[in-house]
Amino acid sequence: VLCGGRSTRLGSDKGLFAPLGDEPLFARALRLLGERFPELLLVVRNDEQAERYRQALQRIGDADFLARTRIVCDLDVDAEAPSAAIAGVRTALAEATHDTVIALPVDAIGVRAIHLSRLLVGAGNAIAACFGTVSELTAGLIPFPSLWRRPAIVSLANRVFRGSYGVRAALAELGAAAVDPGPFAAELDANSNTQSDLNAYFGEPLFDPFGRRLHYVRFSLTEACNMSCTYCLPEGFPEWYRHKARLSSAEVQTMLAGFRRLGFRKVRLTGGEPTVHPGCFDAVHTARRLGYEEIAITTNALLIGDVTRWLDAGLTQLNVSLDSLDPTAFKAITKNAQLERILGVIEQAIDLGIEVKINSVLLRSVNGTSEQIAAMIDWALARPVTLRFIELMPTKLNTSFAGGERVLGSELEPLLSQRGLERVNPRAGSPNLLGPSTNYSHSVLPGRIGLINPMSCNFCDRCNRLRITARGELKLCLFGDKDHSIDLASPETVAAHVRQLISTKPERHHLEDGNFGNVSTFRTIGG
């Protein structure tokens, strides 16, 4: 991440700029790079700037990021143009412990993880020294994001010595191969020249009365579902609830735009089963076009089909409901026998580089044995996925059932420690906390395990989300007593109405007191 460039309007420390209470630009860039890269370099101008970034990095407090991130100073700091991006690329190649480097400026606000994935896939095993991205605006190669290999370092050093600082010209001289960003080209042209540009792009942040930053909205597109999971409907779907509400595509688009004006950067589409809604796929595309950085869907995966089309539409995260790897237990819970189909979708998503999370609800009498749980854990640890065990939560229609079947997260901790898993600390200084899940990782194996314990360990203090029901109403708390109507006349009215209602968001739920709110079944809200 190139942090040392001068900017007449944002200054030389632009990477430390935090738009309207958000995280600094450099922290955002590191988050977008995510866990796919074993080494993260912040290339800065000099030792003084390095110290400022070092202090800011410590405030993030993520041990994993700290272990993988190094701050290095520009090798050409005494050159005539020490802030030239080409010098930063050369420095990265010289300092990196790996032979391949992806470079991007700290203020490249339009860059997404998908752009970096396409660069990596496009480069593959090709022998070219560098790869550039094609811009929709310029109809040619743009300097960043770009991929560079070690052999390019000699040419870059010579260009700096000659006073030739253009990265685009360096790409051309080295015969850079072009990588097409596909449907994501327009994002690369996002403007970040001024603080006004940045504030307009990121939106005006929303805080609740308890100081929690809200940046994540969950849309229940429909109450309809093509499964009948036991924990959702232990006695079947009641006759009085046969009508299955569904948001219209126009309502979804209006609300997506409204929440972007409030600085929301993550959206999740849920149900029921969201893919039974005819506008689900278009909603993903709309969210990408509006600038949401994280676009997720929680699904049983039966109707996903080819994951590639979802990736091209803008999907960045796939959450799959999978309660057992045992076909008999799976069918007993879901009333469905297509386990292999779901596993195939998961494997394809992994191959495509989409972030995959597996949601598993344990029932003591069905899939809650230590053998079944251990099998799920071992399967997940062997893959770059996060398997999250969710404590069965009570609703109006499953209270007695939940009490008898619930497996507490604390019961799983011995299985995790036996496999050498250690707890992952969240980034305490970042507004992008890890949410309700307490995560565990292994020092060698790629998978992670998460425990979501709403009953035994209240996580309301980390709440960063709002929910929209399939009836188009705002749910301020998953277990709140009231849903609120929203004025859907325009994105502006949506934003204004949500900002007005946020003052009534409660501090926490009261499940332990038997107050389950107005949720009848999880089919109506999607979790």
Positions of the model-derived regions?
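Nucleotide and nucleotide-moiety/phosphate-recognizing core
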Residues: L2-V167, A172-D189
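A short acidic, helix-capping loop that chelates divalent metal ions and anchors anionic groups
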Residues: T8-S12, T138, S155, E187, ...
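Short, electropositive alpha-helical surface patch
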Residues: R52-V77, A283-R288, N367-T386, L445-N453
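Active-site oxyanion/phosphate-handling segment shared across diverse enzymes
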Residues: P151-G203, S443-E473, G480
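N-terminal [4Fe-4S]-dependent radical SAM core
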Residues: G203-R218, S228-T230, R261, S437-R448, ...
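Canonical Radical SAM [4Fe-4S] cluster-binding loop centered on the CxxxCxxC motif
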Residues: P209-S249, L262, L478
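Radical SAM/AdoMet-radical enzyme domain recognition
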Residues: S249-L269, E273-I390
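Accessory C-terminal segments flanking Radical SAM cores
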Residues: K396-F516, T521-R523
